[in-house]
């Protein structure tokens, strides 16, 4: 891939952008109904369901709206009212979009729950939220049914499959249902109760308003290289619908997680473009075949997914014909090796982005694959989190809430007001029933993310790790991400996680847990080779003094490595050795 016209448009993009958030807004209206109610857009594809062994299913915006109207009537008959929490325990499928739309247009609150959750995780969330109803399928129905006795607020379960739930709902047989009157929600009204992934402790329910979806759009459009629209297009007027894009989106990110919901599903529908749904397990084969079959143009892939694809298909163009225009990645640092692979082999410059459940999509890149001549975009620096997206005032701050000098590590934080002094709509409303935790998230008007970074002279942020992931070894400050990225550059390493191992003399040793690539076996010789590899690229104090090979790293349901689990394991082992 060659760089064509590389200009830095970051400063003027931030200066020119102004938020226009309506007083009243509902996600269901913005993402579905406005497309379904017009004859020239009603039959546009909204959801394409991929099947590995059968033809794909296609559903239009009109079909989503008709089914959602019917489901809203059913939910109302079960006593669901505005403000109630409704649990949705579904994978990527057409009915998930129907369920979300139905709940939102009633003014109720969607509580997405992953099917990967075990009984304890589900019970905690159902009890903590006091959800009044659960929407399930044949996979999740039985476990939710068993929990109803311990979750008295849950009145019933509605099943999206014929053999699930207390009552079944067929989303495809609802074409004659009476229209549902859209609730008059304010943009600041609650829309989603989504629980944090729990990398640092018990999950907290973050209450997200409808307007947060609008707040995500600048980051989405930038990280997806303008999502198929012309950078020189004119601003929309009034109720005019966006047009001109032929984008097709797919991401393996679960739609029950902020990343899958706000970074893929909802923005795609908001712009009237289809998203591919796939509820099976991820694999490199699946990813390439799916993207080729459905001519996917835009995607959000975790670094772990990109690493797997790079290892499985070093030269994918020899086997697949892809139409990729943009790749966004988040969750962990991409690293130099994956960044270079995507440029050289996929023809796309990865746009890394950063955010969290509470303030999503606030920092990232907009590389435009090297063509920034039309006043849009800026260069992506390999390994950098990127810069603040338009509409967001981001800084690295110290413990007192003061901005850190260039190159000095601090907490990545988002200000309540953008650079023009306008309120930023991306903020969460607070943690569910936890006012103290909500208040502790802020220092003045700065919302702390708990992620450490440095900022360079050009405004690029460089990730240093979670505040609780960074540790000291022999007096040196160790950030695990840089060491992990270095390890993954070695052909034998599929994935890696670095944690402290307690040591009486040094305080901690640097320890790496390594998942080997196919064709490699654990050995003392390989340990020495990996240590030499890191020593040759990083500082001498950063190389892992100990390496343990494991089959898989502990991961959250959202694809993030749970270093905390490994760190606690090391602490437990050390305690047993202490006399």
Task: Outline where the language-model segments fall.
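Gly/Ser/Thr-rich phosphate-binding loop
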Residues: 270, 296-301, 312-379, 393
């Amino acid at each position: 891939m060659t760089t064509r016209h590389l200009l830095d448009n970051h400063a003027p993009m931030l200066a020119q952008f102004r938020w226009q958030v309506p007083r009243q807004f509902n996600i269901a209206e913005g993402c579905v109904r406005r497309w379904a109610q017009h004859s020239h857009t009603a039959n546009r594809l909204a959801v394409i369901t991929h099947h590995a062994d059968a033809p794909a299913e296609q559903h239009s915006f009109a079909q989503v709206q008709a089914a959602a109207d019917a489901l809203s009537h059913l939910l109302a008959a079960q006593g669901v009212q505005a403000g109630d929490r409704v649990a949705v325990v579904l994978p990527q499928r057409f009915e998930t979009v129907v369920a979300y739309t139905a709940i939102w247009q009633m003014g109720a609150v969607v509580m997405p729950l992953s099917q990967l959750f075990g009984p304890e995780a589900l019970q905690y969330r159902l009890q903590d939220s006091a959800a009044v109803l659960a929407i399930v399928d044949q996979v999740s129905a039985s476990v939710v049914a068993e929990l109803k006795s311990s979750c008295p607020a849950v009145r019933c379960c509605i099943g999206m499959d014929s053999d699930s739930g207390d009552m079944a709902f067929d989303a495809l047989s609802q074409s004659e249902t009476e229209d549902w009157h859209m609730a008059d929600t304010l943009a600041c009204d609650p829309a989603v109760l989504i629980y944090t992934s729990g990398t640092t402790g018990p999950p907290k329910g973050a209450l997200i308003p409808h307007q947060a979806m609008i707040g995500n759009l600048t980051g989405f459009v930038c990280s997806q290289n303008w999502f198929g629209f012309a950078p020189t297009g004119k601003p929309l007027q009034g109720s005019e619908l966006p047009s001109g894009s032929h984008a097709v989106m797919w991401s393996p990110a679960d739609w029950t997680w902020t990343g899958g919901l706000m970074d893929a599903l909802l923005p795609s529908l908001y712009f009237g473009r289809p998203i591919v749904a796939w509820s099976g397990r991820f694999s490199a084969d699946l990813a390439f075949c799916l993207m080729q079959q459905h001519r996917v143009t835009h995607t959000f892939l975790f670094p772990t997914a990109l690493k797997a694809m790079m290892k499985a298909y070093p030269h994918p163009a020899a086997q697949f014909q892809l139409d990729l225009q943009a790749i966004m990645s988040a969750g962990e640092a991409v690293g130099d090796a994956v960044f270079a692979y995507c440029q050289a082999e996929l023809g796309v410059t990865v746009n890394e982005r950063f955010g969290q459940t509470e303030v999503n999509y606030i920092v990232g890149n907009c590389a435009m694959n090297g063509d920034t001549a039309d006043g849009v975009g800026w260069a992506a620096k390999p390994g950098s989190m990127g810069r603040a997206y338009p509409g967001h005032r981001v800084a690295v701050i110290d413990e007192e809430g003061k901005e850190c000098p260039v190159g000095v590590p601090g907490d990545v934080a988002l200000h309540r007001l953008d650079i023009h002094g306008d309120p930023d709509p991306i903020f969460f409303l607070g943690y569910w029933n936890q006012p103290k935790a909500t208040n502790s998230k802020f220092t003045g008007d700065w919302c702390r993310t708990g992620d450490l970074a440095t900022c360079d002279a050009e405004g690029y942020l460089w990730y240093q790790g979670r505040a609780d992931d960074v540790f000291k070894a022999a007096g040196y400050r160790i950030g695990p991400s840089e060491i992990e990225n270095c390890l993954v550059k070695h052909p034998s390493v599929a994935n890696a996680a670095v944690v402290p191992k307690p040591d009486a003399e040094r305080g901690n040793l640097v320890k790496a847990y390594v998942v080997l690539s196919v064709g490699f076996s654990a050995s003392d010789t390989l340990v020495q080779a990996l240590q030499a590899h890191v020593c040759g690229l990083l500082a001498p104090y950063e190389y892992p003094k100990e390496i343990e090979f494991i089959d898989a790293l502990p991961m959250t349901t959202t694809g993030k490595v749970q270093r905390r689990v490994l760190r606690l394991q090391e602490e437990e082992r050390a305690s047993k050795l202490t006399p």
